[in-house]
A protein has these predicted regions:
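Alpha-helical transmembrane segments and their lipid-water interface positions
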Residues: 27, 31, 35-42, 67-74, ...
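Residue-level hotspots within the lipid-embedded alpha helices of multi-pass solute transporters
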Residues: 28-32, 68, 108, 112, ...
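Short alpha-helical transmembrane segments in multi-pass integral membrane proteins
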Residues: 1-21, 81-148, 190-245, 303-368, ...
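Small-residue-rich hydrophobic transmembrane alpha-helices
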Residues: 53-113, 150-169, 277-341, 372-391
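Short runs within selected transmembrane alpha-helices of multi-pass transporters and secretion channels
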Residues: 143-161, 169-177, 198-211, 293-297, ...
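Transmembrane helical elements of multi-pass membrane transporters/channels
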Residues: 19-38, 142, 176, 205-209, ...
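Helix-terminus/linker motif at the lipid-water interface of multi-pass membrane proteins
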Residues: 29, 33-54, 123-130, 186-193, ...
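N-terminal transmembrane alpha-helices
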Residues: 8-48, 61-76, 80, 84, ...
């Protein structure tokens, strides 16, 4: 047993959680910068920044779908690999890693081909108008070239975190994000490439991150090694990954469906300005929830490892602390959106109309997100413990069962504001339900551990 993963079961819990969560939070924050920095620069392009920002916002469902497939393979396999490390079965952990990598390559080919062929009708379906389609198409056409890099960088980085190497995982993201921040103004403004320049900067940055991740996993520094032999897909391994990966996949892919529903509703009841406001709201949503997800992803290996080792008291203590920290995080970050929305909104646009509208709807939209940390912590606990069915139900609850129907029904009675109010209603109901399911499920799992 390597001392780096052994400490997951023996190091002082508070210090261990901090050492793993902090780099993971930093990595997630940095990762958000890929798309958010693009939007910040794009929104300030002279002459057409407002239309360009709306157009790029329309591509969000495609970007989310690409990330969802990386989560399917990465987050579906990494907890399983961590559990195997806890059982001191390195060979099985490496087999899971290799099959995940094989899936990521396969997904990249399929996604690139599909969206390249059907991008125009898809973008119109996602809320693009004749005034914004050119910017949406310019951005996504180039972004799709780098799908393989996004898949590998995001999906395989979970295996670096899963073996307790949170700092290495953070560097994987940091390298690409810093490069993206530097290249964006160069390609957008200096080389006058506009929206296309933002996409080129993102692709190049993700490529560097992907190379870094793969290089680490094939090296002797990695507790579990990535090999070509293990990339040959095996039915039993894929079934295991799919069982656990379907939940994070649904969590992310349904974000695309949510965005489509919201954008089409806003286009119908409001127009381009309202779609533009949603682009900003989605970006701020990432700024609030991604750091919390970073906390849960950093702590996840502790739960999975100790679950595999049968250390129930350590599992219980870890989950309690994770819930408290996540709730505190969303209360603070969402509080800014509720009480001082101009702080977030001003980052993305200087258009007076868009500023006023977004500042008006942001406090309403983020009311429920203030307690969403509970949902994030519980969801990660289900995944970490291998509770695939429960995790799947929770993933479906908030978005498919609650949010999408509410976003369709409420504007019929409340007008365009009904779309914004659907989010907090769905969030509160989902958090309450998840909390009840968590208490029942965890008691049963710990009793049988």
């Amino acid at each position: 047993m390597n001392h780096r993963d052994e400490r997951l079961g023996s190091a002082p819990l508070g210090k261990l959680m901090f050492s793993l969560a902090l780099p993971s939070v930093a990595a997630q924050l940095i990762n958000v910068l890929y798309n958010i920095v693009d939007r910040m620069y794009i929104g300030h392009i002279p002459g057409y920044g407002n239309a360009a920002l709306t157009g790029v916002g329309v591509t969000f469902p495609i970007l989310t779908m690409i990330s969802a497939f990386s989560a399917f393979a990465g987050m579906g396999g990494a907890p399983l690999a961590s559990i195997q490390l806890g059982k001191q079965n390195r060979q099985r952990a490496e087999q899971i890693l290799g099959n995940s990598a094989g899936l990521l390559v396969l997904f990249s080919v399929i996604l690139t081909a599909f969206f390249s062929i059907f991008k125009t009708p898809v973008l119109y379906a996602f809320g693009a108008s004749d005034a914004t389609i050119v910017y949406a198409r310019d951005y996504i056409s180039i972004y799709l070239i780098g799908t393989i890099f996004v898949q590998l960088a995001l999906g395989l980085n979970a295996y670096i975190s899963g073996q307790g190497e949170a700092k290495i995982a953070m560097l994987s993201v940091l390298i690409g994000a810093v490069l993206n921040i530097c290249l964006d103004p160069l390609f957008i403004f200096v080389l006058h490439m506009g929206v296309r320049g933002a996409a080129v900067a993102t692709v190049l940055s993700q490529a560097v991150s992907a190379i870094w991740v793969v290089h680490f996993l094939v090296s002797e520094k990695s507790v579990m090694r990535l090999t070509l032999k293990n990339m040959h897909l095996k039915k039993d391994v894929i079934k295991m990954i799919a069982g656990l990966g379907i939940s994070p996949f649904i969590m992310q892919s349904t974000e695309s469906l949510v965005t489509i529903t919201l954008n089409t509703g806003l286009q119908r009841y409001g127009g381009d300005l309202y779609v533009g406001s949603m682009s900003i709201l989605m970006s701020v949503m990432q700024m609030i929830t991604i750091p919390v997800q970073g906390i849960t992803q950093g702590i996840q290996p502790i739960i999975s490892y100790n679950s595999g080792a049968g250390n129930k008291e350590r599992v219980k203590a870890t989950m309690k602390r994770m819930i408290l920290v996540c709730l505190t995080g969303t209360l603070l970050l969402a509080g800014v959106a509720i009480f001082a929305p101009q702080i977030y909104t001003g980052l993305f646009t200087d258009n007076k109309g868009l500023l006023e509208l977004t500042c008006k709807v942001m406090p309403v939209y983020f009311l429920g997100i203030s307690i969403f940390g509970i949902q994030c912590a519980c969801q990660t606990s289900f995944i970490s413990l291998g509770q695939a069915k429960v995790s799947l139900f929770i993933a479906l609850l908030r978005k498919i069962i609650l949010l999408i129907p509410l976003a369709v029904i409420l504007p019929k009675f409340m007008g365009v504001m009904g779309i914004y109010r659907a989010e907090p209603i769905a969030d509160v109901i989902s958090v309450l339900t998840t909390s009840a399911v968590f208490i029942i499920t965890v008691k049963k799992v710990l009793r049988n551990m």
